[in-house]
Amino acid sequence: MMSAEPFSVSRCTARLGRIAILWRGDETERRGATLQASRFKDVFAALANLGVDAEPVVYEDDVLDAVRSQLARLDGVLVWVNPLHDGRNRAKLDALLREVAERGIWVSAHPDVVLKMGTKEVLHRTRTMSWGCDTALYRTVDAMRAELPARLAAGARVIKRNRGNGGQGVWKVEVLATTDGRPSVRVLDATKAEPEETPLEEFLKRCAAYFEDGCVIDQPFQKRLSEGVVRCYMAGDRCAGFGHQKVKALIEAPAARATAGARLYTSKADPRFQRLRRLMEDEWTPQLMSSLDLARRDLPMIWDADFMLGGRGVDGTDNYVLGEINVSSVFPIPDEVAEEIAQRVVDRLKSKPDLAAAQTVVER
């Protein structure tokens, strides 16, 4: 049973507040963590420039109590931890973050917001939005066994586990002609280069463990995937930058794989993506908030949405199809995004009643 004593909140002097930037790492990294050596050094610097004191907090499950003590002294925490990492999940961390949030420490992104926004289920919940497509959700392997064959008959599908990162649990699936009375499929793991052929039932067995995360998502394969994926970075409800990448994941053609490369980052002013920016800021993010019952203040300080190209409209403009939303550990980021994050942190800290009152006293 965790202590029920209230957490302390830092007292503002000439500064706006004190926060942590938290990421996962081993004991060596924890002992040697500094602002200057951190991969988040630009975020630390941007926060300092706006009057926010930030410190590194390196997390692992076996130092949970020490991390709790660190967070107890602070006003908030920005969290960069993937859902899955070397076989470990976020279960213990999420419990800690819920605890500190209940005791007045601001958490971004809150685990409950991650569950709403940062899992593949959001693709099904928002499928009727104009970024959506023919998206199915399976709660059990039996439901998947019953419904997937009919969808495969219409074309290749992409199967996605509800929680994961780095392409883990993502498969392109195509139906094969039945030769021995058993349906077979051709599957391509997003983390691998070569497809394999297997009985459908064997593939379903592989997917059985995914249902521990609550569901499996099924979307049509987007034929224009080889043209690239556009990542729209969001700071709260405002666009903060873009990344464009020719990907290898789920791509089989050697020529297309040969053109794949690193993600190229640009500012929010990139003229190629201004239509996408307007859609995200003016239409899709408000609709997302309404669909998920989220307030503006609930939105993560940094999150992103990955878009593939769908069909073209009658006027020739590209339609964007949402592939996933990333909330848990959005990094690396375009250079300009650090300042956007810092400004959203300032806005959030100023909205806290205790800090707002302290700031008023200082300004007097």
Region locations from a protein language model:
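C-terminal active-site "lid" helix and adjoining low-complexity regulatory extension at the edge
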Residues: 293-304, 308-364
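Short beta-strand-initiation
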Residues: 154, 227-229, 300-304
